[in-house]
Regions:
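Cysteine-rich modules of extracellular adhesion/ECM and protease-associated proteins
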Residues: 1-145
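Acidic/polar, compositionally biased interaction segments
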Residues: 119, 141-385
């Protein structure tokens, strides 16, 4: 009689990796999950790089297209590329050095170019230099809405609960709050594209007891500690590149990632795996999230975030969402209409970077839900005359 999780494959089981944890290739009912192969019973399953399905620790999967196309043979993005649509070609990364980004040939964004079909191949209508090839006609069209968007992310693991002789990071599991505390960061990113600390609600600072500025008391310890939240720092945090995969909601133009109330993507990894992080209810809390996405501004995009703890969203390097501090789930949205375009310095047709910074700083619930509406870009469609 088959017993899922015992390490032996007996029909109707299709796999058995000796556990009943879904998301690792073999489901909790011992069915094979898409994008994986399970060759040996009782052993971990492995992802299938090149099948066009983003699975496991893959950072991209363009369906096994040619080398040097942006997604490597090990399913990691190649330098200078972004791979945000599973199963489709990666595209060149726009150049952003302040203000509007500069579109580059191959990024799939038709800005100041005769055409751009998202690749650097010749003989497909749009050349490697983004010129329309002889005997072809290229039109700028709204890109066909993909089923998913896969946005690159970097998680950084901090020690929230000390274990195994480790030391807790000062900003983790220290403070409390009953709602958002705005003003922890300035209104613009620094030259490295990272948030700038204000110290407004610093522990021991002049505003700690100021209920107008800091209604929930101190929220941070120091600039030196804050500057490590989104910077790789040996011995303090462990970085993990990944993707946040947003699913299309019907034909609404909306894409949603919902991590639920137990969003702890580094459980079983980082300091937890090294035995230096004490778990809370079996989960690894104490991490930050850095997510970036390029978009051509059309004037009707909507972003909504719902979660905890600190969340800051910048567009064009300017602060658009400010729900910092320790708090339970808070929801905030921003519509990039006329009023917001002036505030953020956005011009229709130009390319900008969306940068989201998040921190989970207290064990318990962890909520993370991101909704992007209208952020799918235009591209070129070329046809033979």
């Amino acid at each position: 009689m088959p017993v899922c999780g015992d390490g032996t494959v007996i029909a109707p089981e299709k796999c058995d990796d000796k556990n009943t944890t879904p998301g690792d290739g073999c489901s909790d009912t011992c069915a094979l999950e898409k994008g994986w192969e399970c060759k040996t019973a009782s052993q971990p399953c492995t992802t299938v790089c090149g099948d066009g399905i983003l699975a496991g620790d893959e950072l991209c999967d363009d369906g096994g297209k040619a080398p040097s196309d942006g997604c490597s043979a090990t399913c990691t993005p190649e330098n200078g590329f972004v791979c945000d649509v599973p199963g489709q070609s990666c595209r060149k990364k726009p150049s952003c050095t302040g203000g509007a980004c500069t579109s580059v040939c191959g990024d799939g964004l038709v800005i100041g170019e005769a055409c751009d079909d998202g690749n650097l191949a010749d003989n497909d209508g749009c050349s490697a230099t983004c010129n329309v090839e002889a005997t072809y006609t290229c039109q700028t069209v709204a890109a066909a809405p993909p089923a998913q968007l896969a946005i690159p992310v970097v998680y950084r693991d901090f020690i929230s609960i000390a274990a195994g002789g480790s030391t807790k990071f000062p900003d983790q599991y220290t403070f409390q709050g009953g709602g958002a505390t705005p003003g922890i960061v300035t209104a613009a990113l620094d030259v490295d594209g990272l948030p700038v600390y204000t110290g407004v609600c610093e522990q021991g600072g002049p505003n700690e007891a100021n209920v107008q500025k800091c209604p929930y008391g101190a929220q941070t310890t120091s600039k030196a500690n804050f500057d490590m939240w989104y910077r790789d720092t040996d011995g303090v945090n462990l970085p993990f590149p990944g993707v946040v995969q947003l699913d299309r909601v019907g034909q609404t133009g909306a894409y949603v990632f919902d991590g639920g109330t137990t969003f702890t993507p580094l459980t079983g990894k980082g300091w937890d795996k090294q035995g230096k992080e004490g778990l809370f209810e079996g989960r690894n809390f104490g991490f930050t999230t850095e997510l970036r996405y390029f978009f051509a501004y059309q004037g009707d995009e909507v972003l909504e975030f719902s979660g905890d703890d600190d969340v800051w969203v910048f567009m064009n390097g300017k602060l658009a969402v400010d729900i910092g501090g320790l708090h339970s789930k808070v929801t905030q949205n921003v519509t990039l209409g006329v009023a917001k375009s002036g505030e953020l310095g956005l011009t229709v047709g130009k390319v900008y970077e969306l940068a989201l910074f998040h921190a989970e700083r207290r064990p318990g619930g962890s909520n993370f839900k991101l909704t992007l509406t209208g952020f799918v870009n235009n591209t070129s469609k070329c046809t033979k005359n």
